Structure formats: C-alpha cells, structure tokens
C-alpha cells in the first residue's frame, strides 16, 4: 500500500510553491490594478474602459516575454539542483550566469520592441480610437521601461528554489508583484492620477532587480568560498 511520507511531500510542495504563490499574487495585483484603473480612469480624459482594455493587452504581451524566461528557468533548474547536490558549485554558478545572460538578451530585445514599435504591438490585438492607442502606447513604453532587467528576477527565484532555498525563492517570486508593485500602484495614483500606475511599473521592476542581484551575489559568493575551502 502506498503511504505518503510527510518529509517527501514537504520537499515536493516547496519546489512548486514559489510558482503557485506567484500566480496567486499576479491575480491579486490584476484585480487591484483593474479597480484602480477604473476609478482613476473615470477621472481622466481616457475614461475607465480604455485603460482597463489597454492594460489587458499589455499584460498579454508581457506574458509572452515572461513565458520565455520561465521556460529557460525551468530548463535550468535540474542543472542547478543536480550540480548543487554534487557540490560542483562552479557548474552551478556557470549555469546561473548562462541563464541570466539568455534571459537578459531576450529581455533587451523585447525592451527595444516595446520602445520602438508600441503602435504595431498594440495593433496586433485589434483596432481602437486615437485615445486608445495614445494611452496604450504610452503605458507600454513607460510601464515596461525596465523590461531589459526583468529576466533576472524569475531566474533567481527558480535558482534559489532548485538549490533548496525554497523560502528565499518564494520571497524572490513575490518581490515585484506584491512587495513593490502592489503598494506603488495604490500610492502613486493618489498623487499622479492614472499616470501613477504607469510609473509604478519600472520602479517596482528596478527594486526587484536590485534585490535579486544582492541575494544572488551573496549566495554565489558563498559557493565560491566553499570551493576554495
């Protein structure tokens, strides 16, 4: 008779918990964001419908970019985990650098596309009024301004999870959506109106980027020290 072992279940659950919590966090942020856009959009020239529609489109575009980074991360996790368990820390560090480099290159390509071709990207999802494209293009260029740095956060979250640091992996997965973005999209519109939502994005991205770098450098430094010893 198959009898589950609690210690094994905890280990298995911890590996997927970061992704699970991140998906829940994204849903919560989207709900809050839609309500903020509806409220502040009604007090702007755009009305409430245009901002919500535009943000929905741009969220889909961002999901394409994030799906690629998450795919690279998931493909790298067995490599990180196996070599970390074998104490081959040089390979762990090398694999992490390759993953970050790959995601950064992809992120940079998306960044330039967002900045140079916002009208064409938004137009893929349909037509709209002049105000619709005006808001969508501006939102895409401002909110996604830090796209070139956005690949490091999901890579770092997956990295920490794969080497047995599930709690830190969960924290890293929550940095952008919950710890930084959620408070900013609530606070900024109080002073800047609907524009506050746009500027909350790159600031949250920058903060999550810095935090990911700090924690990753610390852990990679420990591995380097362990190799010397």
Region spans (language model):
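Hydrophobic alpha-helical transmembrane segments of integral membrane proteins
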Residues: 9-11, 49, 60, 64, ...
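N-terminal membrane-sensor/transducer module of prokaryotic signaling receptors
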Residues: 41, 160, 167-169, 187-188, ...
């Amino acid at each position: 008779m198959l009898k589950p072992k609690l210690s094994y279940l905890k280990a298995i659950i911890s590996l997927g918990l970061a992704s699970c919590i991140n998906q829940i966090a994204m849903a919560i942020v989207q709900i809050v964001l839609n309500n903020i856009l509806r409220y502040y959009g009604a007090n702007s020239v755009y009305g409430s419908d245009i901002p919500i529609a535009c943000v929905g489109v741009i969220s889909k575009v961002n999901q394409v970019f994030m799906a690629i980074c998450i795919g690279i991360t998931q493909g790298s996790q067995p490599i990180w985990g196996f070599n970390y368990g074998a104490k081959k820390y040089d390979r762990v560090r090398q694999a992490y650098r390759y993953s970050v480099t790959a995601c950064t290159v992809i992120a940079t390509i998306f960044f330039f596309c967002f900045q140079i071709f916002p009208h064409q990207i938004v137009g893929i999802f349909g037509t709209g009024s002049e105000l619709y494209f005006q808001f969508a293009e501006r939102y895409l260029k401002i909110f996604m301004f830090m796209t070139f740095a956005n690949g490091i956060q999901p890579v770092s979250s997956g990295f920490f999870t794969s080497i047995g640091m599930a709690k830190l992996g969960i924290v890293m997965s929550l940095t952008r959506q919950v710890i930084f973005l959620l408070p900013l999209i609530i606070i900024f519109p109080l002073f800047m109106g609907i524009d506050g939502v746009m500027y909350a994005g790159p600031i949250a991205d920058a903060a999550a980027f810095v935090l990911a770098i700090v924690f990753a450098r610390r852990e990679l430094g420990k591995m380097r020290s362990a190799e010397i010893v």
